[in-house]
Amino acid sequence: TENEKAVMHIFSGRQQTVLSSVTSELKGASPAAFGSLGEEDQDYFTYIINQLKEKKILLQKSIDKTDEVYQEWQSGTISAQEYLNHAIAQNWIDITQFTIDEKYSDSTEIYDALCDYIMDDIATDTGFSKIIYEYLIKAGSVSGKQLCLILYDQGVLAYDAEEISSLESNAVSPVSFLKDKIKNIEITPAQLALDPCSGSCVITDVKTGELLALVSYP
């Protein structure tokens, strides 16, 4: 739909800007200390480092927590570039996870290969894209109305001409719209990645075993 195309156009433009910024921090001559980055950029690099850990590229068990550079990274006084280069030098990085045919022996080549891996990964990573969308929404670049209408465009909600018209004319706010859909379980917490996604509770009389209450969601 036109609405989907408009949102994707906004996202694609912002994504290219973000990827360029990440590349500059990883490969540029003057990378910024993590602590001096804005909240958005910190979120991107926190995600990148966490992904390297989860994929066992940055080996948590190998990291020396007393290492001076590691502690500087934890305190935000050095850049991701410096931290990752140091991690390579200290053998905290498993290079077999991202090198293919060529045997890398030079630390610069290893770092370049790691950067290429990171950039290829985040360019298609859903979790990373969600962070971009989060800040687009916070900045108002993508509106709540657009997101609500996309729920119809993508079949998450059954087509309802009256409700769509209300959204388009601003007769109903996106917040009120979503609250109503969640209340009626047309949209579940699980779809919004909210906890609890499901749950149940059973209350009995401990003396008699009598069932007093039973409830579940959804």
Question: Model-predicted segments: where are they?
Answer:
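Periplasmic/cell-envelope proteins involved in peptidoglycan metabolism and beta-lactam response
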Residues: 1-218
